[in-house]
């Protein structure tokens, strides 16, 4: 078996603590499969540099690395505070102004006119994932007076949630469209759409998105939960954005919804990412809390395709340690004797299609024959994704001639992808795969491989073949 093979993927956010080429390489070496670029804190120039550095590492180590850009969406954020931060005390009366910058040390700027038009007296204002809570006392044209209910240190650019205030927003802002165009030009692999409220939001993004770029629907609004089935059908993947979700919903409801969203993603055969505060204490600490370890482990046990690091890897003191810890937790869970049976018990009925039936049969056949690997030949990646949905015990070795497909699959559970442009027919593919598998000690002479593919090879979406070969 490949050294350090792990089925659950790690998505790390890139930022000041991890943007340099040598640091990116170290993070990949320690377990990162793909990188997230948070457009809320990144301009187009920085976005270009991040992508360039990641691709430089990818070329050097000859391993596909996925890139996901996370659009800000209609996210409300605090403007620029004087000296970048201010301390709010419980009971303190604060002034909020419709401005991009504060004019004094006690003023909170919110550069969003629609907030001042829509918010009402007694409405709550949550800031920084609910760490700070204000209650509105008075509203005028461009000024809000509020009382501090939950105190804390407020920093510039922190997110704002208004769970009782109705704002009419499109999930795709003008700034988002600019970042989408930049992402397409730079060749990113995934685009995460924030604050989705309905399937229409995904359709709007698809109209301007390149066909090679996959759409990740971020689930962080109660209205999205009301349409979760349709959103899961339309999107290419789901991200459980627990920060805003835990502010918009009662926080105690989030774990139950996490299970439900993972289940919906798996029903529809879409990769799902669990994100936000997974190893939060490791922003400054060299070790996580026991609760954080349990949180990551729970996401892995529930069958999440990927777990995500946010500030831990973007601005934290110890990005490498955070990645190493997440890697160790995932490995430990996957070695648990109950892991595979738990995932199998969670599997819903196989969708009624030939490709899905073949993917399911490949998993069963590999188990019956004690085959250590399932090989998928794919152009679009769909064969590998369908086999992944079954959560087989075996490695899923996906072979594709398209580097963009390999990058996309870095966020799909269990998939190890190799790019091979030389094969023009199935027999050549089998020969190449045998050689690679023996070289990497994935399989021994005399063992069997289960192969799935679509014939003819170059035709998309035609998974119609299952075959068993013996390695000689």
Where are these regions (language model features)?
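Non-catalytic helical/linker scaffolds that mediate oligomerization, partner binding
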Residues: 1-472
């Amino acid at each position: 078996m490949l050294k350090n093979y792990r089925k659950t993927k790690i998505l790390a956010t890139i930022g000041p603590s991890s943007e340099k080429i040598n640091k990116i390489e170290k993070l990949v070496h320690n377990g990162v499969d793909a990188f997230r670029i948070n457009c809320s804190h990144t301009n187009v120039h920085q976005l270009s540099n991040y992508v360039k550095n990641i691709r430089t590492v990818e070329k050097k180590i000859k391993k596909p690395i996925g890139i996901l850009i996370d659009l800000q969406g209609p996210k409300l954020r605090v403007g620029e505070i004087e000296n970048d931060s201010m301390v709010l005390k419980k009971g303190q009366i604060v002034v909020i102004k419709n401005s991009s910058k504060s004019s004094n040390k006690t003023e909170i700027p919110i550069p969003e006119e629609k907030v001042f038009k829509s918010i009402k007296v007694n409405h709550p204002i949550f800031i920084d994932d609910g760490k700070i809570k204000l209650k509105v006392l008075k509203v005028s044209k461009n000024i809000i007076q509020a009382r501090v209910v939950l105190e804390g240190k407020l920093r510039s650019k922190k997110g704002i949630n208004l769970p009782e205030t109705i704002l009419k927003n499109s999930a795709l802002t003008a700034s988002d469209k600019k970042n989408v165009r930049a992402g397409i030009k730079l060749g990113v692999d995934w685009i995460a759409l924030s604050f989705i409220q309905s399937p229409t939001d995904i359709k709007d993004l698809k109209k301007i998105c390149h066909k090679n770029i996959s759409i990740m629907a971020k689930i962080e609004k109660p209205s999205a939960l009301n349409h979760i089935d349709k959103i899961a059908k339309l999107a290419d993947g789901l991200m459980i954005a627990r920060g805003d979700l835990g502010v918009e919903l009662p926080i105690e409801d989030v774990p139950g919804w996490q299970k439900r969203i993972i289940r919906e993603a798996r029903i529809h055969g879409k990769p799902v990412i669990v994100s936000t505060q997974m190893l939060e204490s490791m922003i400054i600490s060299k070790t996580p809390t026991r609760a954080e370890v349990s949180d990551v482990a729970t996401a892995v046990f529930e069958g999440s395709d990927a777990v995500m690091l946010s500030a831990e890897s973007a601005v934290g003191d110890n990005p490498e340690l955070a990645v190493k810890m997440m890697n160790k937790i995932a490995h430990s869970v996957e070695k648990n004797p109950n892991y595979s049976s738990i995932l199998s018990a969670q599997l819903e009925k196989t969708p009624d299609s030939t490709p899905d039936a073949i993917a399911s049969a490949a998993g069963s056949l590999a188990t019956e024959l004690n085959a250590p690997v399932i090989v998928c030949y794919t152009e679009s990646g769909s064969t590998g994704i369908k086999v992944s949905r079954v959560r087989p015990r075996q490695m899923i070795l996906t072979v594709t001639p398209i580097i963009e497909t390999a990058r996309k699959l870095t966020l799909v559970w269990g998939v190890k992808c190799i790019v091979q442009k030389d094969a023009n027919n199935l027999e050549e593919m089998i020969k190449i795969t045998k050689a690679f598998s023996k070289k990497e000690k994935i399989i021994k002479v005399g063992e069997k491989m289960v192969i799935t593919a679509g014939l003819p090879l170059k035709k998309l979406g035609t998974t119609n073949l299952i075959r068993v070969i013996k390695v000689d």
